[in-house]
């Protein structure tokens, strides 16, 4: 079922533009798709209904089947549900998430695009973790860290290089890790569940965790039974 493209200027309740954002743009299938993909092995087919809660609620035996499939890691039926997201995030976040090999990824390329760069600046600067080699600790007491001047200088340098005739694929080398990028990210229900199960853990980077929780919310809305079965309810 297609949903069409969504406006890509999302805001929070205060009207502030969210710099890191996952927008659902398309999806296919439902919880019933999981059930019927499994039951076809026996030449069977189910349908929605039969329980209180609305026309698109699984029958009790079908809900139990979905949880059984997830518990025993019978993943192929979950592969018949598919979603696509349009993601906007800084490069340093994107380079962590691209490692999930079963999700399809097509990203904007500054070999071809020379639009003025946008930069991500966190709301809070976090302290260095003291008990591990990676990660971060609580917010710094001294938040007097300013990168705006550097960002403006980098943007000016980038634009001047292009103006002098330097090709896009070389001019991009001066852009920092907090430059915003965007990509289409598509995959099956089980592939996104695997990503979210990993990226929502407490020891993951906050920025990637934030993005994973946004995807979690969309997938939970689309596939409430299947998503819960695969993620055990992300907290």
Predicted segment positions?
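Family-specific signature for flavin-dependent thymidylate synthase
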Residues: 2-235
């Amino acid at each position: 079922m297609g949903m069409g493209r969504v406006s890509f200027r999302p805001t929070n309740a205060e009207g502030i533009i969210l710099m890191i954002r996952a927008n659902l743009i398309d999806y296919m299938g439902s919880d019933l798709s999981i059930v019927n993909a499994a039951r076809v092995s026996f030449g069977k087919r189910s349908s929605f209904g039969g329980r209180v809660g609305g026309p698109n609620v699984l029958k009790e035996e079908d809900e139990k089947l979905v949880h059984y499939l997830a518990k025993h890691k019978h993943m192929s039926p979950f592969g018949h549900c598919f979603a696509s997201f349009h993601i906007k995030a800084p490069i340093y976040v994107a380079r962590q998430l691209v490692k999930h090999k079963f999700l399809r990824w097509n990203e904007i390329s500054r070999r071809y695009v020379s639009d003025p760069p946008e930069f991500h600046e966190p709301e809070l600067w976090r302290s260095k973790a003291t008990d591990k080699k990676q990660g971060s600790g609580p917010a710094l007491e001294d938040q007097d860290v300013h990168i705006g001047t550097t960002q403006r200088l980098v943007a000016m340098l980038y634009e001047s290089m292009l103006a002098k005739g330097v090709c896009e694929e070389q001019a991009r080398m001066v852009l920092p890790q907090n430059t915003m990028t965007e990509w289409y990210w598509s995959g099956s229900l089980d592939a996104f569940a695997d990503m979210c199960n990993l990226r929502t853990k407490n020891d993951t980077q906050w920025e990637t965790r934030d993005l994973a929780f946004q995807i979690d919310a969309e997938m939970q809305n689309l596939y409430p039974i299947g998503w819960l079965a695969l993620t055990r309810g992300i907290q």
